UniProtKB/Swiss-Prot annotation:
Top-level taxon in the UniProt lineage: Eukaryota
Protein name listed in UniProt: Ciliogenesis-associated TTC17-interacting protein
Tissue note: Strongly expressed in round and elongating spermatids, weakly in pachytene spermatocytes. Expressed in Leydig cells (at protein level). Expressed in testis, placenta, prostate and lung, and moderately in ovary and brain.
Polar residues composition bias: residue spans: 1-10
Disease: Spermatogenic failure 54: An autosomal recessive male infertility disorder characterized by oligoteratoasthenozoospermia. Semen analysis shows markedly reduced sperm counts and severely reduced or absent sperm motility.
Length: 387
């Protein structure tokens, strides 16, 4: 398998223009930044739910399904500190012209939809040359690091770009876009003349806009429902703009999604129960009972109580960390699709990008394939041994 490393984003690393070929980076306007600043925690609480849509062709034939989930989660920062965040997981799988395709998205966001970390992956099983693309976005100190890899057949190309954090105010990642659409549906409005920032398909910084297309009544599961239509447009640096229309119910559920120029669409098949307010269940309270060590029945009863408490605690942990289920689900999906000979190495390569202590990729290419396993030696000992 051949491997290539390419460098992109020279404008991003040296963002001061030095000539006519080096243009300044685009900037979000005040309307976009003010809209993001207006978000508050109580509003976001109403947006925590999952949904599933069917992917259909222009003739109505089923092609696959799309799942979107937004939950409250926890994010481990570089120094090991845990902070609360918005966890976004989306995935789709289906067929495109009878060829298997799919994608997956994992994102961690702040309450102002600032990006903490995001990983995306999509593939198309072309008969002659299968293609797979991966992109990772990570906030590193005062930089946004973007790592892209494209695999066509056995050839892999990798590129790393960094943007100054101060230059991406108003940046909307793929994960943030899914949350922002729910906010617009809840408010029933789109910020007027707002111009956000995003990345195009080539990983270049560009403008992102939203347009209010008004209200429409559609039929969902034999029911009439009013939807709020928002058109999102990515103004790529090169090529024509890419637009997508979202038909949103009053609480943010997605009823329909249309990619402008694409023959198919995603539609909801069952009318959800529209949310009005979020009900937070109180945490279970377990009373401490005095333990009489002389009585075996009391000791056994205490054992059973403690066992139940641990079981509920484990279930509560999984509810608070939905990324655990999402990661395992994506891993099993790609394991079934790829069917690698070495499952252990495949698992190490899949979960490697989520390791906070994983060393960064070298800037220069190498003929040696990087080892996906973490060294058992501490970094300091390894250096001293090499010396």
């Amino acid at each position: 398998m051949s491997s290539k490393v390419y460098s992109t984003g020279s404008r991003a690393k040296d963002h001061q223009p030095s000539g006519p070929e080096c243009l300044p980076l685009p900037e979000a306007n005040a309307e976009a930044i003010d809209f993001l600043s207006s978000l508050h925690k109580e509003e976001l609480q109403m947006l925590f739910f999952s949904e599933t849509l069917a992917m259909v062709s222009d003739t109505g034939e089923p092609q696959g399904e799309l799942t979107i989930e937004v939950q409250r989660g926890k994010y481990q920062e570089k120094l090991g500190m845990l902070t609360y965040c918005l966890f976004v997981h989306a995935s789709s799988r289906g067929f495109l012209d009878k060829m298997l395709c799919g994608n997956s998205l994992l994102g961690y966001l702040s309450e102002k939809l600032e990006l903490m970390e995001q990983h995306s992956q999509d593939f198309i099983k072309f008969l002659i040359l299968p293609m797979e693309r991966k992109m990772s976005l990570l906030k590193q100190d005062d930089q946004l690091a973007v790592t892209r890899s494209i695999k066509e057949g056995e050839e892999v190309k990798t590129g790393v770009t960094s943007f100054p954090w101060s230059s991406i105010k108003g940046f909307i990642s793929e994960a943030a876009n899914l949350v922002l659409l729910r906010v617009m549906a809840w408010r029933r409005m789109v910020p007027s003349n707002a111009r956000f920032l995003t990345l195009d398909t080539e990983g270049k910084l560009c403008y992102l806009t939203y347009q209010n297309l008004g209200f429409q009544t559609i039929q969902v599961d034999h029911q009439q429902a009013e939807v709020f239509i928002v058109e999102q447009t990515v103004h790529a640096e090169e090529g024509i703009p890419m637009s997508c229309q979202y038909y949103l119910l009053s609480d943010g559920h997605l009823a329909k999604r249309i990619q402008v120029g694409s023959p198919g669409c995603c539609i909801i098949t069952k009318m959800p129960i529209l949310r009005e307010e979020d009900e937070i269940e109180p945490r279970p309270v377990f009373e401490k009972k005095p333990l009489v060590w002389e009585e075996d029945m009391e000791l056994y009863s205490k054992f059973l109580d403690r066992k139940e408490e641990l079981r509920l605690g484990h279930a509560s942990y999984l509810r608070q960390h939905p990324e655990a289920h999402a990661l395992i689900s994506d891993f099993l999906l790609f394991l079934l699709l790829r069917q690698p000979e070495d499952v252990v190495t495949f698992a190490a390569e899949f979960f490697g990008p989520f390791d906070p202590w994983r060393p960064s990729s070298p800037a220069l290419g190498s003929s040696h394939r990087p080892n996906p396993f973490r060294s058992l030696e501490p970094e300091g000992d390894a250096r001293s041994g090499a010396a």
